[in-house]
Each structure stands twice: as C-alpha cells, then as structure tokens.
C-alpha cells in the first residue's frame, strides 16, 4: 500500500500512540461485550457530513435569542470543512486504519461493525465538525450547561477511535482544527453588526395589528 510522505510521517510518528489508545478504548468492548457499539454509532451519525450539526446551527440562527450561537456555529463549521475536507484530507491522503489488513486495528475494526468511510483519514471530519460547532457554544453559552457541548465533542472523537474509522492522531488533528475554527468563528461573530442579531426572520401573529385597527 503506497502512501505519500505526509501520511507516512504521521504513521511513523504517532503509530504507537494510535495503537495504544485504540486498544485502551477497546477495553470498553471487552468489558461490555459490544454494548457501546450502537451508542458510538449513534454519536457518530450526528457528525456524518456535519448535517445534524448544520441543522442545529440553522435552527439556532432562526431565533434572535440564539442567533449568536447559530452564527458562530455556522461560521465554525464552514471554516472547519474548508480546512479539513478541502485541504488537509486531500493533501495528506492518509488511508483509514482498517485498510491495513495485517494490522491490529483491522482486527478491532472487524469486531465493531466494519463501518466503511469513503474519504481519507486525516484529520477526522466528524471531530472537526463537533469541535468547530461546540466550542462556540462553550465560549458563548452559560457555563452551567455549555460544558456539555465539549463533552459531546470529546465523545465524538472517542466514537471515531472506537469504531476504528480513525487513528487517534486523526482525532487529535480534528480537535485542533475544530477548536481553531470555533475560536475564529466566535471572534467573527462578535464583530458582526448588531443589526444582524436583531433581524426578524418571521413575525408572530401577536405582532400583527387587529383587523379593526388595520381597517
């Protein structure tokens, strides 16, 4: 299996880490007999193509009270997708961990559903999208609940390692790119004019004058 210099460097530099963490995460499988597999598949589904996260950001964008969250999330997702999907995945072109059928990770992959992904491995797009959208919620939200946003993002990364569709270093790369995208998104969102956050995308019936007054 031929790989380019960038992918080869990742494999040689982080190979031990990738295998060690994957084996540690898979102790969950050993302890629970596959109980965690459907859970991590559901978590992973929410990051597929970023669709669920995009829909969430658009829903928050619709209402004035949550528009700052939605705006930052949309910007973060866009920045993360550009860096990850349009640049790094193409340039580095790292094969998925299950491609090497002689490796221990392939054996783990066989145990947890044999999920196949169509694009390259580094960095993790799911993890990028999770952090790019959740970091703004953490920064802008009430700290009594916003920590759960980061919990979701970290769980997404663990899910990708557990399902053996990413190396640990892929997930770390996604974490870095996603966090960067999320922070930049917050900065941009704070600099947008206040008029954007005061726009009415809809008008409730209660805001319309009664027929007797409009006649």
Question: Residue locations for each model-derived region?
Answer:
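Membrane-interface junctions
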Residues: 27, 31, 45-49, 63-64, ...
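Membrane-helix interface segments
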Residues: 33-36, 65-70, 141-148
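Short helix-capping/hinge motifs at transmembrane helix termini and TM-loop junctions
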Residues: 63-64, 92-93, 163-167
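Transmembrane-embedded, aromatic-rich helix segments that form part
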Residues: 52-56, 171
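Membrane-embedded catalytic cores of phosphoryl/pyrophosphoryl-handling enzymes
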Residues: 106-215
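N-terminal transmembrane-helix/juxtamembrane module of multi-pass inner/ER membrane proteins
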Residues: 1-53, 89-115, 206, 210-215
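Alpha-helical membrane-inserting segments
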Residues: 59, 79, 83-88, 92, ...
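Interfacial segments of alpha-helical transmembrane regions
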Residues: 56-86
């Amino acid at each position: 299996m031929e790989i380019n210099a960038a992918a080869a460097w990742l494999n040689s530099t982080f190979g031990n880490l990738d295998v060690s963490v994957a084996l540690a995460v898979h102790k969950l499988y050993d302890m629970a007999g596959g109980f965690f597999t459907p859970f991590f598949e559901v978590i992973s589904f929410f990051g597929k193509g970023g669709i669920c996260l995009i829909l969430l950001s658009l829903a928050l964008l619709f209402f004035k009270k949550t528009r700052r969250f939605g705006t930052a999330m949309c910007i973060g997702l866009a920045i993360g997708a550009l860096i990850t999907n349009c640049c790094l995945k193409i340039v580095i072109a790292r094969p998925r961990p299950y491609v090497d059928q002689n490796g221990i990770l392939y054996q783990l992959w066989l145990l947890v559903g044999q999920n196949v992904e169509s694009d390259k491995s580094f960095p993790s797009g799911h993890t990028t999208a999770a952090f790019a959208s959740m970091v703004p919620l953490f920064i802008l939200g009430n700290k009594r609940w916003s920590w759960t946003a980061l919990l979701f993002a970290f769980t997404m990364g663990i899910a990708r390692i557990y399902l053996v569709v990413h190396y640990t270093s892929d997930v770390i790369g996604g974490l870095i790119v996603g966090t960067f995208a999320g922070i930049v998104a917050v900065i941009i969102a704070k600099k947008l004019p206040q008029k954007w956050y005061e726009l009415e995308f809809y008008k409730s019936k209660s805001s319309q004058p009664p027929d007797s007054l409009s006649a």
